[in-house]
């Protein structure tokens, strides 16, 4: 097993996650099996109760793990399935060690950070690195580990010390450290400054880790003189200084690393069994990056949510939209709308914001209402849903978005004016959305219906069934406490709101479609968590197709392949005016 540790310096949030994912991608393209571990030094057990404003979205895994959004990057880039133990937090480590101490496993010894916490970290990493993450079930050969935060943070000290010991335990030829640092370029001088990187590497080396590669994040490509200066002061060769400058799309980052000889360096440094032949997977990434840069047509989607001021709150939703837009050769334009701005209160208090929000909504080609919690902004979301339904605008509601679509329909079409979710109005006489038996209100963490669940299609004419390739069932990831009231199903269906997908017991409403509408779909699960750059998610793909007026054409052509299998390994036709059918139909693999 080979271990690649990615650390960060100067500031957090400079792209360690994307760089770690890109390293995994170029190694996977060399026919290696790669897994990933993300270490978060906070004391929380998991990311389940985080505010979206503080940490961005909570990413959900197959096993129900609520984890950092960086694990979403790993899954999308590497096309793997991780588990909750691939996200290691200080809270999990301390909980594990304290439980052992309570059971008497330490035989009365004084339990300390060194050696007990550091040993627990090393054991966790070595155990998790061996768990298969690919569909073929083969044990990984390389483990990419991202240490969150920056070197020098008091929270990450036990982890740095653990890896200082770890490099000797697994031996030098099996361990490699990549340090990601910022090279700022002040506008006053326009000169690239190396001092922050020098100090960061000096601090890392003082803690016992010496970087093998220094990855410099900068706005423009590094000058040769700057590379040489970093090489001289950071104890690395000039070819070990890697420049990752700002690029047009993140699909360029693996290509950028490949061009600078990162794979060749790993081959020598870690003695990896990598040939020098062209890598097919990277060719696919290059095709995607080229396609992205020459898109001519655009498609606008209104994202009506609560956390629109911080785009990371909807990271997977945005990626799923991008994947689908790229598949139909359209540039995505997202119009972020705070749902509270659509409400009557805003009209009274800030009429300009109100009219601007409605102008954005009305000028969009499709409308998306994603998941969320809490009552704030829900009436604005209902207003947006009503507009999409009445104006026959393509609409996708995810999780809470689906629940509110049912609430809006019950209010307007069935005439139940006080219809609501018991989350927002426990005393409503028409509880259209109710809490589930699993929900335990006494404790907030881990009390939702989480993880991969099966949804059975109950309608042969369902648009969603066709988009999923005609399969009898789908498996998608869930994260919710409330569900559509199954007792009201018949009354809603009689008026045209069809529940075309249910859980395996037929009790939970999972997919809803409106009759006589181009695309009005709600899903209780979160399809964005399984969207991939080369396998877009069917509900999002359907929204984009409907928004550009090509959904009926796509369905008429047979939908013989699920949108999850969009690109073949040899996608040779990538012109902007390519027919959808050419992208979707099976292509012969000539290899």
From Swiss-Prot:
* Enzyme Commission number(s) from the entry: 6.3.4.2
Top-level class of the enzyme under EC nomenclature: ligase
Q: Which residues form a coiled coil?
A: none
Can you supply one Gene Ontology CC term for this chain's record?
Answer: cytoophidium
| Active-site residue list | 399, 526, 528
Q: Which GO terms describe its molecular function?
A: ATP binding; CTP synthase activity; identical protein binding
Q: Which UniProt keywords apply?
A: ATP-binding, Glutamine amidotransferase, Ligase, Nucleotide-binding, Pyrimidine biosynthesis
Q: Which SUPFAM superfamilies match?
A: Class I glutamine amidotransferase-like, P-loop containing nucleoside triphosphate hydrolases
Quote the catalytic activity from the record: UTP + L-glutamine + ATP + H2O = CTP + L-glutamate + ADP + phosphate + 2 H(+)
Q: PROSITE patterns per the record?
A: GATASE_TYPE_1
* Pathway noted in the entry: Pyrimidine metabolism; CTP biosynthesis via de novo pathway; CTP from UDP: step 2/2
Write down the InterPro entries for this protein, in alphabetical order. Answer: Class_I_gatase-like (IPR029062), CTP_synthase (IPR004468), CTP_synthase_N (IPR017456), GATASE (IPR017926), GATase1_CTP_Synthase (IPR033828), P-loop_NTPase (IPR027417)
A biological-process GO annotation: 'de novo' CTP biosynthetic process
List residues of the Glutamine amidotransferase type-1 domain: 300-554
**Domain of life per record:** Eukaryota
Q: Name the family.
A: Belongs to the CTP synthase family.
What is the annotated role of this protein in its UniProt record? Answer: This enzyme is involved in the de novo synthesis of CTP, a precursor of DNA, RNA and phospholipids. Catalyzes the ATP-dependent amination of UTP to CTP with either L-glutamine or ammonia as a source of nitrogen.
Annotated protein name in UniProt: CTP synthase 1-A
Gene behind this protein:
ctps1-a
């Amino acid at each position: 097993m080979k271990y690649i540790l990615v650390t960060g310096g100067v500031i957090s949030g400079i792209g360690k996650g994307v760089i770690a994912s890109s390293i995994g991608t170029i190694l996977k393209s060399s026919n290696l099996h790669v897994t990933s571990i993300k270490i978060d030094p906070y004391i929380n057990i998991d990311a389940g109760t985080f505010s979206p404003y503080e940490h961005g979205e909570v990413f959900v895994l197959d096993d129900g793990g609520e984890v950092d959004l960086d694990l979403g990057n790993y899954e999308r880039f590497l096309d793997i399935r991780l588990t909750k133990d691939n996200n290691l937090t200080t809270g999990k480590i301390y909980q594990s060690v304290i439980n052992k101490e309570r059971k008497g496993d330490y035989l009365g010894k004084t339990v300390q950070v060194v050696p007990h916490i550091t040993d627990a970290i090393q054991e966790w990493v070595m155990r998790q690195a061996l768990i298969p993450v690919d569909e073929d079930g083969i044990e990984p050969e390389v483990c990419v580990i991202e240490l969150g935060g920056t070197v020098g943070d008091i929270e990450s000290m036990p982890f740095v010390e653990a890896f200082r010991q770890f490099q000797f335990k697994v031996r030098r030829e099996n361990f490699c450290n990549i340090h990601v640092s910022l090279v700022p370029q002040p506008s006053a001088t326009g000169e690239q400054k190396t001092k922050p990187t020098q100090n960061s590497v000096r601090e890392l080396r003082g803690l016992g880790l010496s970087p093998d590669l220094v990855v410099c994040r900068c706005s423009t490509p590094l000058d040769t003189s700057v590379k040489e200066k970093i090489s001289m002061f950071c104890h690395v060769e000039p070819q070990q200084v890697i420049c990752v400058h700002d690029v047009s799309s993140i699909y360029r980052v693996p290509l950028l690393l490949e061009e600078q000889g990162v794979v060749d360096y790993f081959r020598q440094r870690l003695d990896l069994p990598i040939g020098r032949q062209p890598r097919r997977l990277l060719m696919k990434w290059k095709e995607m990056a080229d396609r992205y840069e020459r898109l001519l047509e655009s498609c606008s989607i209104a994202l009506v949510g609560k956390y629109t001021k911080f785009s990371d709150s909807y990271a997977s939703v945005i990626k799923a939209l991008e994947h689908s837009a790229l598949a139909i050769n359209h540039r995505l334009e997202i119009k972020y709308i705070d749902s509270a701005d659509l409400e009557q209160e805003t009209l009274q208090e800030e009429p300009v914001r109100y009219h601007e929000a409605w102008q954005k909504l009305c000028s969009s080609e499709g409308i998306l209402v994603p998941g969320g919690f809490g009552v704030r902004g829900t009436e604005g979301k209902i207003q947006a849903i009503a507009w999409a339904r009445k104006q026959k605008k393509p609409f996708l509601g995810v999780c809470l978005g689906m629940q509110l679509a049912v609430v809006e329909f019950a209010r307007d079409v069935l005439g139940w004016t006080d219809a609501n979710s018991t989350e927002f109005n426990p005393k409503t006489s028409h509880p259209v959305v109710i809490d589930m038996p699993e929900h335990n209100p006494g404790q907030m963490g881990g009390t939702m219906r989480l993880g991969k669940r099966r949804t059975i299609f109950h309608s042969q004419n369902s648009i969603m069934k066709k988009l999923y390739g005609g399969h009898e069932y789908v498996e998608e990831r869930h994260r919710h406490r409330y569900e559509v009231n199954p007792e009201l199903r018949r009354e809603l269906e009689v008026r045209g709101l069809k529940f075309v997908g249910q859980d395996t017991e037929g009790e939970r409403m999972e997919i809803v479609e409106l009759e006589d509408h181009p695309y009005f779909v709600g899903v209780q699960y979160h399809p964005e968590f399984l969207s991939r750059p080369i396998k877009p998610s069917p509900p999002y793909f359907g929204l984009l197709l409907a928004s550009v007026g090509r959904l009926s054409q796509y369905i008429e052509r047979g939908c013989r392949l699920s949108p999850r299998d969009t690109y073949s390994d040899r996608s040779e036709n990538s012109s902007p005016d390519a027919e959808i059918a050419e992208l979707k139909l099976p292509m012969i693999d000539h290899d």
